[in-house]
């Protein structure tokens, strides 16, 4: 394991050589697993979202924030951790398959979404980095395994943004299926509001 998580913390970075460019603005966002020990699968931890502000503060420092993507199931885990079990890179509980939200950050129309290959996309607030809501209801996605709150919904973590249509396109597929049952692949479109629409492809 080449990476090490650090949990929720903030930094103020100093420019130690040269000059920070004055013609940049906005922020850079990075997400990855908050993995703090070398054992186990690299993807098997909750997503830690990092925000690097490109405009220095009054003292010329670069602000860096880290926040755990605190989904409802992550909050349940803090209270009822004994109900959760890790199997390779998945986490299972009576609530379903935990959406670890740790693989990709996608922005469109001033909104930000985090992807994970075994869960619905999640919207987060780009200013506070706090969890807002999953994209679509569970019923709108193809489910590979049941779950009360989070069924296993295999949704490719890297959607395609269509800025003209103001929409996100996803691949939603079956990761596992019973013997004799063919796996399915669907193209999904979400217009940033309302229901997710899907079309089966072969």
Q: Which residues make up each language-model segment?
A:
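Beta-propeller domains
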Residues: 1-202
């Amino acid at each position: 394991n080449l990476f090490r998580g650090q949990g929720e913390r903030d930094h103020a970075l100093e420019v130690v050589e040269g000059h920070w460019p004055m013609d940049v603005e906005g922020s850079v966002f990075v997400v990855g697993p908050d993995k703090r020990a070398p054992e186990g699968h690299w993807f098997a931890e909750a997503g830690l979202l990092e925000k690097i502000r490109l405009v220095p503060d009054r003292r010329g420092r670069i602000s860096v924030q880290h926040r755990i993507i605190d989904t409802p199931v992550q909050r349940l885990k803090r209270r009822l951790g004994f109900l959760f079990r890790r199997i390779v890179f998945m986490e299972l509980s009576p609530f379903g398959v935990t959406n670890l939200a740790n693989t990709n950050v996608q922005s469109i129309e001033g909104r930000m979404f985090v992807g994970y290959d075994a869960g619905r996309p999640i919207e987060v607030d780009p200013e506070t980095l706090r969890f807002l809501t999953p994209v679509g209801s569970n019923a709108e996605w193809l489910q590979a395994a049941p779950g009360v709150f989070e069924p296993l919904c295999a949704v490719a973590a890297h959607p395609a943004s269509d800025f003209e249509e103001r929409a996100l396109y996803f691949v939603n597929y079956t990761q596992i299926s019973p013997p004799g049952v063919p796996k399915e692949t669907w193209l999904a479109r979400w217009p940033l509001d309302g229901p997710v629409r899907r079309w089966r492809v072969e």
